[in-house]
Amino acid sequence: MEIQNTKPTQTLYTDISTKQTQSSSETQKSQNYQQIAAHIPLNVGKNPVLTTTLNDDQLLKLSEQVQHDSEIIARLTDKKMKDLSEMSHTLTPENTLDISSLSSNAVSLIISVAVLLSALRTAETKLGSQLSLIAFDATKSAAENIVRQGLAALSSSITGAVTQVGITGIGAKKTHSGISDQKGALRKNLATAQSLEKELAGSKLGLNKQIDTNITSPQTNSSTKFLGKNKLAPDNISLSTEHKTSLSSPDISLQDKIDTQRRTYELNTLSAQQKQNIGRATMETSAVAGNISTSGGRYASALEEEEQLISQASSKQAEEASQVSKEASQATNQLIQKLLNIIDSINQSKNSAASQIAGNIRA
């Protein structure tokens, strides 16, 4: 029996040693993935629930580490695929693999590589599932941040509106009070002062008429016939009782009352104007107070928006890392299939060789 071989035996052993070294490197990467997965506790069941309490920094760091390791595994997988592709070219029907020089250790090495890749595929699948849960948790956190952002904006708007309306109402009430006081001063103090002024003017006019009448009237009293040229002297004119009462109660007291009412009117007017100014100033500051009360809500909304962006970034990185892990798992699966094909080819070659040997012995 002649079994063709395109590579020398020494070269085949060299390739097996190289693949063993690469398998050790892949074993180390698989251990790294298992260490990463150990930091993400999960409750495995029909509906797995993420129980991790990683903060944003830890999540970003974990995602970056997973992405870095996934890139390394992807490069190693591509290299392994190329090596196996080159090896598969030697397993065509025209160029059958020669197993006559292979020892049991070489076959065991190929089987160990297949087992190692199977474990790596399992770890990558588990890591991809865990990263998917992390991405879901980050997306859920982003949705909660959106809800809290809306509530903060709504509460700040309500607070600002209530504050502005309340302060405006206080200012309007103060202005209305000032206007009412000014109207009261006009109705009471100014009207009283004007009435007293009319009374004073009437009193003076009546007194002047009475004096003029007494001075110009002829004297018929017999006691004045003998006065001669002094009969019209002021000292000889007798005043009536009304005139004496007017003179005994001078108009100074009435003028004082008028002055008092005038001063009271002016004071009340100034007080009313002050209230109006305070009311207008209060209403003008209501907008500022409303903006200040609303700014707190806007600040809280901005914080929630920042948390939302962080959660979205974390979710995106976790999804990308999960996708890379799934792709690496698929590549590993393809590599395992090729190794299994190699093992199957070896078994077929061994069986064929055994059959030919048995036939030769019988012959």
Swiss-Prot record:
Changing residue 362 to E: Retains 32% of invasion activity. GO terms for cellular component: extracellular region; host cell membrane; membrane. Residues 1-16 have a biased composition (Polar residues). Residues 17-30 have a biased composition (Low complexity). Changing residue 346 to S: Significant loss in invasion ability. The keyword Transmembrane helix applies. Disruption phenotype: Mutant retains 10% of hemolytic activity in the presence of sheep red blood cell (RBC). Mutant displays normal secretons. It holds the Pfam family IpaC_SipC. The keyword Transmembrane helix applies. It is found in: Secreted; Host membrane. InterPro entries: BipC/SctB. Keywords: Host membrane, Membrane, Plasmid, Secreted, Transmembrane, Transmembrane helix, Virulence. Its main location: secreted. The chain crosses the membrane at residues 99-120. The C-terminal tail is required specifically for Shigella invasiveness, but not for pore formation. The C-terminal tail is responsible for IpaC/SctB-induced actin nucleation. Component of the type III secretion system (T3SS), also called injectisome, which is used to inject bacterial effector proteins into eukaryotic host cells. IpaB/SctE and IpaC/SctB are inserted into the host membrane where they form a pore and allow the translocation of effector proteins into the cytosol of target cells. Induction and secretion of IpaC/SctB comprise the final step in triggering the induction of full type III secretion. Required for efficient dissemination. Necessary for lysis of the two cellular membranes that surround bacteria in protrusions during cell-to-cell spread. Contribute to actin nucleation in vitro, which may be a necessary step in Shigella invasion. NCBIfam families: IpaC_SipC, T3SS_SctB_pilot. This is Type 3 secretion system translocon protein SctB.
